[in-house]
Every structure is written in structure tokens, then in C-alpha cells.
């Protein structure tokens, strides 16, 4: 199979492969993810109570969310298609003393082998990096048990999002390497909600995650989904 058939963008994979060694550098290229992670992890745990539940993180990268979920008592599996990020994730889990099972596979391949196997599925800051996000969402829906919780987060597609997430984050504040994001791959909440409905998921909540460049902190803001946002859905 080609990477396109696997719903994988080889250029996106290569981008994160190059940066993998700095995944856990709190002041490096992934600092925004580290800053955002406590907010994401708390949001998920408050709504899904992850302790002792089987949780799958799709597009886990270097394992930032996986470790946070494992520390909260979840039984965590992380999947990704990048060799270098997965190696970094495995090594860091040994250093951290957390137990996470990391596997190189796509969501679609994994769903075919493990349908309805997880209580919670997370797919954060990943949908804007695949050729067909609707296909990934359908795979996530297949992986979660009936009544289980799914969380997606991504970036809205509008002029403000372009200004903040591309121009501001990559060129002005230099929080991210140039070229990290492709504006055309950003996803409007209405599009994500429709793809979730098509996959048999019921939207529970949508919330924005806003960044203050002065305090350098993120916070939840249910009234502002204009840039970063997270959606909580449940398998019907």
C-alpha cells in the first residue's frame, strides 16, 4: 500500500520525524503542545474519568498526552506512523516510569483489527495533518466501545485562525517551526461535527482553547472556538 492509500501524508510524517529528538524539550519546538497539554488532559479526564479505562491516543507523536493519561491511571495505547517520534515516546516512558504501549500503525489499520476495544479514544492536533480527516474520524468511531468517549481537537479555518495559528505562531512569536501548519487543512467546527455524525458519534460539547501571548497560558473558552478547539463526542 502507498502512504496515500493508508491516509498518511508522507511530508507530514517527515516533518515530525525531523523534530522528534526535541519532542520533550519543554522550551523547544513542541513547547506549545507542552503548554496546552495540562488543559487538554484535565478536560478529557473530567469528562471521561480515565482511571482504569482503556484509552487509545491516535497520532500520539512523542507521547505527551499518553503519559499524562497514564499518570491519571488510564491503560494507554498510543499509535502513530512516525518511527522517530515513537522511539522517543518509548524511551521517555522508560525515563518517566509510566506504562504506555506504543504501536506503529494507522487508525484505519488498527480499527480493522481492534473494533470496539477502547473506552476512550483521543485524536488531538492530528486531523489537520492527514489527507482524509473524515476517514480517521470513522476509524476512531470504530475503535471506541458503544457509549465510549472520543475527543478531537484541531484548528478552525478562518482569517483569525490563519493570523494566529500560522502568521502569529510560526512567524511572529516563532512558537512553532515555519511550515508546521497548512491553512487549507484547517477544519471548521461544522465540518468536524458533520463527520462525527456520519461516523455514528453524538457531540457532547465543543470548547475553544485560547492562548494569551502575554501570560503565555492557554485556557478553555466555550464562547471562542475561532482558533483552537476541542470536541467531546460519544459513540451512539
UniProtKB/Swiss-Prot annotation:
Record: residues binding S-adenosyl-L-methionine: 40, 59, 80, 124
InterPro entries: SAM-dependent_MTases_sf, UbiG_MeTrfase
UniProt-listed Pfam families: Methyltransf_23
NCBIfam families per record: UbiG
Protein name: Ubiquinone biosynthesis O-methyltransferase
Protein family (similarity comment): Belongs to the methyltransferase superfamily. UbiG/COQ3 family.
Signal peptide: none
Taxonomy, superkingdom: Bacteria
Gene (name only): ubiG
Organism of provenance: Saccharophagus degradans (strain 2-40 / ATCC 43961 / DSM 17024)
Keyword S-adenosyl-L-methionine found: yes
Keyword Magnesium attached: no
The entry's keywords: Methyltransferase, S-adenosyl-L-methionine, Transferase, Ubiquinone biosynthesis
Known catalytic reactions: a 3-demethylubiquinol + S-adenosyl-L-methionine = a ubiquinol + S-adenosyl-L-homocysteine + H(+); a 3-(all-trans-polyprenyl)benzene-1,2-diol + S-adenosyl-L-methionine = a 2-methoxy-6-(all-trans-polyprenyl)phenol + S-adenosyl-L-homocysteine + H(+)
EC number(s) given by UniProt: 2.1.1.222, 2.1.1.64
Function comment: O-methyltransferase that catalyzes the 2 O-methylation steps in the ubiquinone biosynthetic pathway.
Pathways involved: Cofactor biosynthesis; ubiquinone biosynthesis
GO biological process: methylation
GO molecular function terms attached to this record: 2-polyprenyl-6-hydroxyphenol methylase activity; 3-demethylubiquinol 3-O-methyltransferase activity; polyprenyldihydroxybenzoate methyltransferase activity
Amino acid at each position: 500500500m502507498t502512504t496515500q492509500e493508508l491516509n498518511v501524508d508522507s511530508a507530514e510524517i517527515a516533518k515530525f520525524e525531523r523534530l522528534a529528538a526535541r519532542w520533550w524539550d519543554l522550551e523547544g519546538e513542541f513547547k506549545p503542545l507542552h503548554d496546552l497539554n495540562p488543559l487538554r488532559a484535565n478536560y478529557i479526564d473530567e469528562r471521561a474519568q480515565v482511571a482504569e479505562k482503556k484509552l487509545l491516543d491516535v497520532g500520539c507523536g512523542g507521547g505527551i498526552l499518553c503519559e499524562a493519561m497514564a499518570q491519571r491511571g488510564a491503560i494507554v495505547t498510543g499509535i502513530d506512523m512516525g518511527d522517530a517520534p515513537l522511539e522517543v515516546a518509548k524511551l521517555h516512558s522508560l525515563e518517566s516510569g509510566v506504562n504506555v504501549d506504543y504501536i506503529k500503525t494507522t487508525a484505519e489499520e488498527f480499527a480493522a483489527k481492534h473494533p470496539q476495544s477502547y473506552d476512550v479514544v483521543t485524536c488531538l492536533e492530528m486531523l489537520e495533518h492527514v489527507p482524509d480527516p473524515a476517514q480517521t474520524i470513522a476509524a476512531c468511531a470504530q475503535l471506541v466501545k458503544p457509549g465510549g468517549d472520543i475527543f478531537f481537537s484541531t484548528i478552525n479555518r478562518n482569517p483569525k485562525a490563519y493570523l494566529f495559528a500560522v502568521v502569529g505562531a510560526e512567524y511572529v512569536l516563532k512558537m512553532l517551526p515555519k511550515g508546521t501548519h497548512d491553512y487549507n487543512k484547517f477544519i471548521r467546527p461544522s465540518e468536524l461535527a458533520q463527520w462525527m455524525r456520519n461516523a455514528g458519534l453524538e457531540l457532547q460539547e465543543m470548547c475553544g482553547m485560547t492562548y494569551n501571548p502575554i501570560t503565555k497560558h492557554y485556557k478553555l473558552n466555550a464562547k471562542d472556538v475561532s482558533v483552537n478547539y476541542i470536541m467531546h463526542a460519544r459513540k451512539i
